[in-house]
Amino acid sequence: MSLKSLVRKVFSFLLLIPIYFYRVCISPLTPPSCRFTPTCSAYAVEAIKKHGPVKGLYLAVRRILRCHPWGGSGYDPVP
């Protein structure tokens, strides 16, 4: 395994920890409110796993910023 690959995996893992914490500990306590399918947290996990930590985080933040009452809704897959 190259150093670049190892660094990418470590940073991806570090970004996924708070998302999994949210999904397990916080999300069950709040009513469903995501306007999109898949949910924003599922989208973030998939984006980070598919595109790596930098582009995945960028895609996840863009998605979260679109998730508001005046934004879009519906099916929005990870590109």
UniProtKB/Swiss-Prot annotation:
Membrane topology reported for the UniProt record: Peripheral membrane protein
Disulfide bridge map: none
Cleaved signal peptide residues: none
Keywords, alphabetical: Cell inner membrane, Cell membrane, Membrane
GO cellular component: plasma membrane
Principal location listed in the UniProt entry: membrane
SMART domains per UniProt: Haemolytic (SM01234)
Protein's cellular compartments: Cell inner membrane
Alphabetical list of InterPro entries matching this protein: Membr_insert_effic_factor_YidD (IPR002696)
Its job: Could be involved in insertion of integral membrane proteins into the membrane.
Alphabetized HAMAP family for the sequence: UPF0161_YidD (MF_00386)
Family, similarity comment: Belongs to the UPF0161 family.
Protein's name according to its UniProt entry: Putative membrane protein insertion efficiency factor
Organism: Bacteroides thetaiotaomicron (strain ATCC 29148 / DSM 2079 / JCM 5827 / CCUG 10774 / NCTC 10582 / VPI-5482 / E50)
